[in-house]
């Protein structure tokens, strides 16, 4: 039983990480589409994101499982990966776009005034501020990603929640479920917070060096 539970916890952890990383990349690309100067690209990005974000994750998984894949027991991990990644990405796009809008135009102009290129301005001025402004919501999205992996059991994925359902002592199963999800969520919060702080410190150091020059 312990091995079964640990195996389920491993599947949940794996799904959470790979889905969240993939969703972040898709979200960044879609956000870039939102910010594009090309009206066609901007419209496509907004329409696509508007459709995906309105589909519940459970419905999306069933869509991939029963219509696209043809068999809900065939490639269940792959189905869960694709469906959950797209759903989380649609939500992250709004988070990233909000972070971009939070950067003051005056700071961008100041960076260009001291001789920074567009790439330097983005990586050393805009990106750190975007990260700093979205970290709290980004952490919440990581926790949400972890929580919705539980719907993957519908298509046959033996994730953490489905393995604890088999425990005869219902109270013990609930406690183990809470402990497992809390562990993954806490670890994710720690990593994301540390990454945000490191980027903020690097940005301040770069600006100080630029001012000295």
Mark where each language-model region is:
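Transmembrane alpha-helices and adjacent helix-loop boundaries
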Residues: 1-213
């Amino acid at each position: 039983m312990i091995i079964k539970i640990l195996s389920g916890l491993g599947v949940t952890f794996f799904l959470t990480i790979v889905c969240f990383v993939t969703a972040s990349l898709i979200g960044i690309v879609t956000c870039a589409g939102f910010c594009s100067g090309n009206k066609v690209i901007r419209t496509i990005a907004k329409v696509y994101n508007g459709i995906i974000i309105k589909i519940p994750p459970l419905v999306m998984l069933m869509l991939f499982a029963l219509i696209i894949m043809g068999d809900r027991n065939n490639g269940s991990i792959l189905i869960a990966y694709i469906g959950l990644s797209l759903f989380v990405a649609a939500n992250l796009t709004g988070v990233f776009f909000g972070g971009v809008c939070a950067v003051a135009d005056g700071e961008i102009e100041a960076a260009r005034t001291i001789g920074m290129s567009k790439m330097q301005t983005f990586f050393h001025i805009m990106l750190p501020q975007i990260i700093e402004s979205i970290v709290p919501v980004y952490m919440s999205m990581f926790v949400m990603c972890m929580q919705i992996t539980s719907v993957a059991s519908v298509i046959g994925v033996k994730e953490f929640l489905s393995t604890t359902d088999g425990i005869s002592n219902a109270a013990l199963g609930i406690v183990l479920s809470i402990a497992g999800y809390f562990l993954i969520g806490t670890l994710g919060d720690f990593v994301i917070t540390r990454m945000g702080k490191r980027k903020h410190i690097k940005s301040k150091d770069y600006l100080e060096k630029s001012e000295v020059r």
